[in-house]
């Protein structure tokens, strides 16, 4: 079974790329979530920075409603991509997002924001 659920903050605005043209095009959003991961032995908070990718309708929602610093919940699966760069294989692990949840930002009153799920 390959399922992952995360809650974190976006480290910067999502990067959007469009593949194809016209009605056959689809969008890809890439973003990084800063996810709290407990505390170390000295009591300092640990943070994991998780790469995420969303396609199609989920990407469209992210593009419209999600910005740097926003709290976001995601459900998805872990995937590994690989490609060659300068003659070396590069391996990248990321979360392929299936659902998103726009969460309230405790430092900012976003009571007008609604949840979005795809």
PLM region spans:
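Single-stranded nucleic acid-binding surfaces, predominantly the OB-fold ssDNA-binding core
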Residues: 1-118
């Amino acid at each position: 079974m390959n399922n992952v659920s995360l809650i974190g903050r976006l480290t910067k605005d999502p990067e959007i790329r469009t593949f194809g043209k016209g009605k056959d095009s689809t969008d890809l959003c890439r973003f990084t979530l800063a996810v709290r991961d407990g505390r170390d032995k000295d009591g300092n908070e640990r943070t994991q920075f998780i790469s995420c990718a969303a396609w199609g309708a989920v990407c469209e929602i992210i593009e419209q409603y999600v910005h740097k610093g926003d709290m976001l919940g995601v459900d998805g699966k872990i995937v590994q991509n690989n490609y060659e760069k300068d003659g070396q294989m590069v391996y990248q692990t990321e979360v392929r997002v299936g659902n998103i949840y726009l969460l309230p930002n405790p430092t900012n009153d976003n009571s007008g924001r609604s949840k979005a799920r795809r």
